[in-house]
């Protein structure tokens, strides 16, 4: 009660009934839950809250909170209450279409259908518009024939997953989605909170509830802070902006769903670089430092960094710095990555020395799979998967390995995840950044990060693959592999 009400004159005054229901899991929420699977209390209260709002809304929920289940049940609830009549539209990232298709089948008796562009669909163009929940990616809506066909179907329900993809109001995919903003029930879901640029709110709500903000010029004058050069540096009137969207926003924080998530234990595992690789690492860091000094000396010739970036000599130095930074990152794992590189410059830094981090990785995998547990392995370097597979096959006989990367189709990725999740003999899944979002690895007890994530957001997305409400484990473990004295 203390979280949702105030005590005054001997009585509790409830300020937010939905929050009270959220924290009181023993309260029965009647007539909510039309899916095959029982919804958690925080999911039921989310659906109830959205039904009470009774128009477009933004759903912010942590990774693993089960936004897919909320979307499907919300559609069923609106259908059962005769608020909507026909099919609904689910808009997702391209890599998640197949995942959504199978989850609709898993969680309901609805018929899903994936919509492709005119060129891809060809002869089956008409048949793909039959179904209860139509699924397409954002870019598919750029296809004039697809978009017009959907608009003419008088769809009453649109749910945009990873809705931060339309935060740039001027992008083509954003404008295509905005064509559907006259529909009453337009929902967007994200695990990524709005961060620095207040215009993100304008872009997202242009789809969810177009009348909240009249136009971008008025929005900028009231809520956007710019410097003398016209660059956005922050926001203004934040409280007023929050109040504007409050009635069309529901949030489920990690604390609110944590009782349904496994406890996540993150541990750093350190190793040293071999002497030859350490020497190369030091050399690269020194070369990067020297290039940056050259850039700083050049800045006296320019008034702004933007002006400097128009200078070829300056941008050449920029490119060299980025290239050497990439090399410095790669050798913290193994200089075999440099051997795989198309860059001729990379080859001069190859030592052929055994990687201490690869050895640490193999030892961790051995201890994990010897207990019969599953582990997912993340790295932003796609070519590392081939290297790790070679080492794993050398260490372990008849080992089965699943892979997720950008070179696979949505169907192939889904099949790889299913193989890892359902087959007892497949205990290892290797993933590039393509697996940071949208895949459910609830059977994995362990995660290994071969290098630190580039940002806290990427790290949160990675961890969200195993920190899920559907996890079969009470505790999940993340090992972050870090090389001492390296980039």
Which residues does each PLM region occupy?
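Conserved Walker A/P-loop ATP-binding site and its immediately adjacent core
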Residues: 70, 85-106, 195-200, 380-383
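Inter-lobe coupling linker of SF2 helicases/translocases
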Residues: 135-140, 147-154, 172-183, 212-346, ...
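Conserved helicase ATPase core of P-loop NTP-dependent helicases/translocases
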Residues: 399-432
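SF2 helicase/translocase ATPase core recognition
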Residues: 183-219, 258-285, 429-487
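Conserved helicase motor "Helicase C" RecA-like lobe of SF1/SF2 P-loop NTPases
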Residues: 379-405
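Walker A/P-loop
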Residues: 55-74
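Conserved pre-motif I regulatory segment
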Residues: 18-60
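Conserved helix-turn-beta segment of the N-terminal RecA-like "Helicase ATP-binding" lobe
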Residues: 96-119, 210-212, 395
């Amino acid at each position: 009660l203390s979280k949702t009400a105030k005590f005054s004159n001997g009585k509790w005054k409830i300020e937010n009934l939905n929050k009270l229901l959220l924290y009181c899991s023993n309260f029965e929420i009647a007539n909510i839950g039309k899916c095959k699977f029982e919804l958690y209390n925080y999911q039921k209260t989310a659906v109830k809250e959205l039904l009470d709002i009774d128009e477009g809304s933004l759903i912010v929920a942590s990774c693993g909170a089960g936004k897919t289940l909320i979307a499907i049940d919300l559609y069923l609830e609106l259908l059962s209450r005769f608020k909507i009549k026909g099919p609904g539209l689910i808009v997702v990232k391209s890599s998640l279409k197949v995942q959504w298709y199978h989850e609709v089948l898993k969680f309901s008796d609805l018929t899903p259908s994936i919509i492709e562009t005119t060129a891809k669909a060809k002869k089956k163009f008409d048949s793909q518009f039959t179904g209860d929940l139509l699924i397409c990616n954002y870019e598919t809506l750029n296809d004039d024939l697809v978009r017009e066909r959907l608009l003419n179907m008088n769809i009453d329900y649109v749910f945009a997953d990873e809705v931060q993809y339309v935060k740039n109001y001027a992008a083509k995919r954003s404008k295509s989605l905005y064509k559907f903003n006259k529909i009453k029930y337009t929902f967007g879901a994200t695990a990524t909170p709005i961060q620095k640029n207040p215009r993100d709110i304008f872009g997202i709500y242009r789809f969810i509830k177009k009348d909240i903000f009249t136009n971008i010029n008025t929005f900028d004058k009231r809520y956007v802070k710019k410097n003398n050069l016209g660059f956005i540096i922050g926001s203004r009137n934040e409280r007023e902006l929050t109040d504007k969207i409050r009635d069309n926003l529901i949030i489920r924080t990690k604390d609110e769903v944590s009782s349904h998530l496994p406890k996540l234990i993150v541990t750093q595992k350190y190793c040293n670089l071999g002497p030859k690789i350490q020497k190369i690492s030091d050399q690269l860091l020194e070369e990067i430092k020297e290039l940056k000094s050259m850039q700083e000396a050049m800045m006296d010739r320019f008034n702004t960094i933007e002006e400097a970036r128009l200078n070829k000599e300056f941008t050449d130095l920029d490119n060299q710095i980025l290239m050497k930074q990439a090399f410095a990152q790669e050798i913290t794992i193994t200089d075999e990555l440099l051997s795989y590189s198309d860059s001729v410059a990379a080859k001069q830094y190859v030592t052929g020395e055994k990687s201490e981090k690869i050895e640490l990785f193999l030892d961790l995998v051995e201890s994990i799979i010897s207990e019969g547990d599953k582990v997912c392995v993340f790295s932003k370097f796609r070519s590392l998967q081939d290297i790790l597979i070679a080492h794993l096959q050398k260490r372990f006989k008849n080992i089965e390995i699943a892979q997720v990367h950008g070179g696979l189709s949505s169907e192939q990725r889904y099949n790889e995840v299913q193989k890892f999740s359902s087959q007892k003999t497949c205990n290892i899944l290797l993933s590039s950044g393509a697996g940071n979002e949208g895949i459910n690895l609830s059977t994995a007890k362990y995660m290994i990060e071969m290098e630190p994530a580039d940002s806290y957001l990427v790290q949160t997305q990675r961890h969200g693959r195993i920190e899920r409400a559907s996890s079969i484990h009470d505790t999940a473990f993340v090992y972050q592999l870090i090389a001492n004295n390296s980039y």
